[in-house]
Amino acid sequence: MESLPSLLESIYTTWLSLSSTIWAMDMILAFVCGLGLYHLLLPFLESHLSSPPSNIKFTRKPQIQMTWQSQFKKKFRNHCRNDAKAWGECLKKLKEKEKDKLFLEEMSPGHHLNSLGNIFNSSSAKQDSTTLSPFWNLKEKSEEQVATQKLSYPKISEDHFQQKCDQLFWGLPSLHSESLVAAAWIPQTTSTLPSPFFLFNVISSVYPIQLQDKMSPMLPHTHPLSYLDLQSPHLILSPLEFQTPALNLPVLLPSSLPYNSDFGTSYSQSQSKPQYLPTEIKYNKKPSLAKQIENRSTLPLMVQKPQEAYDILAPNPSQDWVVSILPDNFPICRELREKLEQHIQKWLIQHQWNFPHKIQVSEKMKELQNTVIGNCQTRDKPGTLQALGEHSNEGQKRKFQLEKESGKNLGPILGKISKDPIRGLEKTTAIKDLENNLKAHLGTKSGQIDQGLTPLSMRQSWLAVDDSFYEMENNLTSLKSSAKSMCSSEKLAFLKPETRQALEAHIVRFWAKHRWSLPLKILKPVKLFQLSIESLPVVLCAQTSSTTSVHRTRSAAEVVRFLGKPCLRQMIIEDSSPSPQNLLLVSSPSCKRARRRLPFGVDHEPSTALPTKPECGHISEDLTYNFMNTTSQTRTIFKKEIETREVVLLPRRTSDQNLEAYKHQEKVVSEFPHNVETELAGQPQIYTTTVLPPKRSRSMPLPVDTLTSHVLGDIVVADMDNSLVQQRPSTPKHLVSQKSQIKMLAPTYQSEGTKRQSEIKYEDRPKLTPVTEKKANFGSQYYQTLPKIAQVLPGRPPQRHLGRFLQWIHPKKTIKGHEFHPLKGNPTAAIVQNQRRQVRKIPYMDNNVTEAQELMTTVGQMLEKKMMLQHQPYASKFNQHREVPPAPMSRFSHGHMPVSYLQQRRAPSYPGSCSCQRCSVQNRHIRNQLPQRSVRFSKKPQNPRNPSHKKPQNPRNPSRLSRNAALNLVNSQNRTIVPGNSNHHLYCPRHCALQRDVCRELGHSSVVFPNRKT
């Protein structure tokens, strides 16, 4: 204590000892600090006079704003004091701006949020009901004006809501982004307080409770007030009634309001139906604002399921749908109210449940509602509320009782559900419609299947398993897929037995098709065919007149045995001869007999007989095709284009008197791997080919005769005297041109007898002239070497291609000595041979031959023009030299030309003549049709002096061409040039050195060429 007085004395003496300037500065500083402190505390002091300290933070900003406005007015008055007129106009504008600004601030959502968040935080329980809470005093107004504040802008409010409704109607702002605030209320008396603001999307944790002497008639209890949520099913709830000894106020229960993530967490109480929640308020010393439900206070809405957190529709709603979403005293006209309610309903339907406008509650949703309602009823019990805010400890206890009232639900939103909906009615109706549609669809498809008008994939599967399914119907065997089909058919018990049976049949066929069907590229190798053939037994046909007995005599064990492999399609072909015992069984492994399903004449096309090539011959006997108990007569080979399968059936011998005299022979043509030819002496000849199915649309109906020919391979079995000869299956050839597919097979092997006959014919030929003999020798040389090339074709690919190229060059030429000569005593083969000879006489023109003829004609004309241009220089000397002196090379014309000279001339001419000779080989088959041209230099032809040149020369002699040139040179001395071979190709002077040498020799011999004549 002693130190403190001494310290004060020292400070006082020090301060007095200072100079006057320092003292003055301290005084000024103290004054400035006091003034600043006054300005800082002035708003607080002014608000403290009219409001409690708890509301200072809400009134500070407006007071500061009004202070600045007053200062601005003072400055403006001083500035405009001189001009009274300008001062009046500015003052009017300023007042209008202030009015508009105040209205906008009152209408702003932030202003109402602040007001709603701080309503009735006062702790005074005896507050005057005629005065508002201090937080309403946001502007510089008197307390009386604040107490009797009225929203006196009904017209402006209506315009504002008109604009909002238009925006909502056109969908400009979304409802979740707009806060519809009912900011305009029209009180009936001046003593009543304004009603609380209704927020459609702005939710606060504390709700307004206004105390007054009388209940405001603006919100009658007969009309509920709805608070709509955007994230869950919405309820139309009525306001709570606070029953007090002196007053009744509309209060909103916090649990009845939904959760909104933008403005905080609220709590909701699940109810079985929309309820009115009247409350009984028992006042103690101090009032409270709101309480939470005890049994749901611990769980926020975020962790609760939407079905459990919100009220769900009752299963049996009543027919009273006259419920308004908006209150009746909402300050908008009736038309705008209806538009707004419709918009809210549409938005709730679209955004809440994501359903269309016509909502049908499913059976699962109803069951879920029942379970949730049962759980909620057990948990929903009356509870107490706890106070919120600063004075929550002094809150009042309120007891809430749940009161059920039917008819207040979301009926208008959900589209007026019936009063007592029958469970399963909609489901039964939908199932019946589905069954009717399915019956009609299956009936149509069954008719198409019966008529054979199914797509390609379905028909292939149907043909693939037709045999096995027929036996399954007769209970001879059971396929593995039968159980699956029966399981699926049990679910389709409403179908007719015929329709169900057809559906099961199609399922079995489709399953087997996907199991058995293989692409043709996999079946290309011959080994795979051989393995499949060796594994399949040969089915013996009973000798009976009925063609259907073969199909029905197959046992069930074979079907089960061949389940993993495609069964054989059988087609019985019976001769029209009197003896019906000789049958020919033709089987193919991918298609089945279509006897039971497809009637004749539905989609069958008459088979057309096309003429074949001479080597294939014709059929001399009539064949009867017994297919699906129908017959059709054909006399020629059944031939298709490349798109269809080709099966050629030749006649078999009907007489049995000379059967033992003939032997069975099997000949396979290897030149075309995709074709197989089988020749049986005295037996039917069967030619089978394998081609790809046509590329057609899957939904395009195809004729039966085309589809039954789409097989993977053919197995030819011939039955004669209980002996069977099995033919190797054909190998599919995919990369073969259409022209080569159309061409028939030509035999490439010959027997010894045919060779002898060809030699005899060759010896008996008449004597030929030198020119014709050279032609014959050249042709015989070419055609004698062709069989050698064809014999080694399978082993050597280059020679195979050469052979095909030669046959393409000569499509009309037949190989001598390779013609089929039947043995004596075989009238059938003789008839076939006669028919072949007749066909040979028919001219055959190919497109390639025609093009080659035109090309050669053009080339010949060009060569003639070029020769004429080369011979024109010698035309001027023709008149001067009538007599030509003997040429120095005349001694070589008699065959005494030196060998060295011939070799010297032959060597350079060989390379040049190769290309020309190749060209001549390609067009040798049309030489007889081309005109033979001879060049004459004199009108009087003379015979050559030396007749020894008429002897035939060896065509294989390499000096033959040079000798012919010498012969032409000798003949040129007599003014005549005759080619040695009339059919010999004229060598091109551009490529052939021999022709250039001949022209050079003619030039040295001073031969004068006259004008050429063609």
UniProtKB/Swiss-Prot annotation:
<protein>
    <recommendedName>
        <fullName>Spermatogenesis-associated protein 31</fullName>
    </recommendedName>
</protein>
<keyword id="KW-0472">Membrane</keyword>
<dbReference type="Pfam" id="PF14650">
    <property type="entry name" value="FAM75"/>
</dbReference>
<keyword id="KW-0221">Differentiation</keyword>
<dbReference type="GO" id="GO:0043160">
    <property type="term" value="C:acrosomal lumen"/>
</dbReference>
<comment type="subunit">
    <text>Interacts with ACTB and STX1A and/or STX1B.</text>
</comment>
<dbReference type="GO" id="GO:0007283">
    <property type="term" value="P:spermatogenesis"/>
</dbReference>
<dbReference type="GO" id="GO:0030154">
    <property type="term" value="P:cell differentiation"/>
</dbReference>
<comment type="similarity">
    <text>Belongs to the SPATA31 family.</text>
</comment>
<keyword id="KW-0744">Spermatogenesis</keyword>
<dbReference type="GO" id="GO:0002080">
    <property type="term" value="C:acrosomal membrane"/>
</dbReference>
<comment type="function">
    <text>May play a role in spermatogenesis.</text>
</comment>
<feature type="transmembrane region" description="Helical">
    <location>
        <begin position="22"/>
        <end position="42"/>
    </location>
</feature>
<keyword id="KW-1133">Transmembrane helix</keyword>
<keyword id="KW-0812">Transmembrane</keyword>
<feature type="region of interest" description="Disordered">
    <location>
        <begin position="925"/>
        <end position="961"/>
    </location>
</feature>
<keyword id="KW-0968">Cytoplasmic vesicle</keyword>
<dbReference type="InterPro" id="IPR039509">
    <property type="entry name" value="SPATA31"/>
</dbReference>
